[in-house]
Amino acid sequence: MALNDFHVSEPYTLGIELEMQVINPPGYDLSQDSSTLIDAVKPQLTAGEIKHDITESMLEMATGVCRDIDQAAAQLSAMQHVILQAASEHHLGICGGGTHPFQKWQRQEVCDNERYQRTLENFGYLIQQATVFGQHVHVGCANGDDAIYLLHGLSHFVPHFIALSAASPHMQGSDTRFACARLNIFSAFPDNGPMPWVSNWQEFAGLFRRLSYTTMIDSIKDLHWDIRPNPAFGTVEVRVMDTPLTLDHAINMAGLIQATAHWLLTERPFKPQEQDYLLYKFNRFQACRYGLEGVITDAYTGDRRRLADDTLRLLDNVTPSARKLGADSAIDALRLQVKKGGNEAQYMREFIADGGSLIGLVQKHCEIWAGQ
């Protein structure tokens, strides 16, 4: 299968996707009513898109192409408002978080959609288990070679993005001991983790052609890499973040990725090499398991650094770019988060430690998303 030509995009423009949980009070399990909610909301949209994801308990909010995080925030806020209004009318709740803490995958209904039904046929129960919720951020690129460079540059900071956004400590009714358990769900997929090494767009086109020989890959959407190029949109898409509990945190994460992309493409601080990925999965695991307390290891020097410390260094490096893009408020908020030493997974554990239940936790998440 031939790959689409890389669509030229305005560099550093943004697109944000948020996979939301559709909740059924008063038990606060996942609902199977996303189709009802989507049908009610679509006629009211003035910008962005609300659509299905894999199962009927998932709802995706997606912005259009945005100049900056303020425009993205305005679109997401408008969508949030109409979704919450429709959810209230249908006696449903909406919340963030990377996993639902006690849902059972066996109960999840795959959407009546040709692509998702084909994926169910290919992957079986793995698709139902993938009822997890992430934030994806697209950044515009001028050409395919820039996209490949940006993908490799952003891959250095996958642990940082995971640790900052980690919001999935519970799964199937248990504390997993992970800050981000969501990404473990994808470990059985054949395309899990980093993209196979290529050095330019021409090599990527060849890689895609060979992957399509498997008959399991019909489009870029069928590849579940942590970061992937999207030629139809002219973007690089970062896919490792848990869906945050608040819209503010989602915007902050998008601002960080936009600023990091600007820094990488203007400063070119790395010369990408295949060896960069030697310890990729080890460092990724540290972020998933321990969050900001994880320790990452340099593949070349063997130096070991706390993720919290290295994240502060990243935030300092991208601050000038953030100012140029109007994303400095996002960097300031994330810097404060790191200095306080927490993420949303830590908050969830503290809620339970203080005597809360998993049902009460989901109820609280719905209240947080609704601004209560």
Swiss-Prot record:
Reaction(s) catalysed (UniProt annotation): L-cysteine + L-glutamate + ATP = gamma-L-glutamyl-L-cysteine + ADP + phosphate + H(+)
Annotated InterPro entries: GCL_type2/YbdK_subfam (IPR050141), GCS2 (IPR006336), Gln_synth/guanido_kin_cat_dom (IPR014746), YbdK (IPR011793)
Pfam families: GCS2
Key words, A-Z: ATP-binding, Ligase, Nucleotide-binding
EC numbers, comma separated: 6.3.2.2
Disulfide bridges in this chain: none
GO terms, biological process: modified amino acid biosynthetic process
GO molecular-function term, one example from the UniProt record: ATP binding
Job of this protein: ATP-dependent carboxylate-amine ligase which exhibits weak glutamate--cysteine ligase activity.
Family: Belongs to the glutamate--cysteine ligase type 2 family. YbdK subfamily.
Subunit architecture: Homodimer.
Protein name: Putative glutamate--cysteine ligase 2
Lineage: Bacteria, Pseudomonadati, Pseudomonadota, Gammaproteobacteria, Enterobacterales
GN (gene name): ybdK
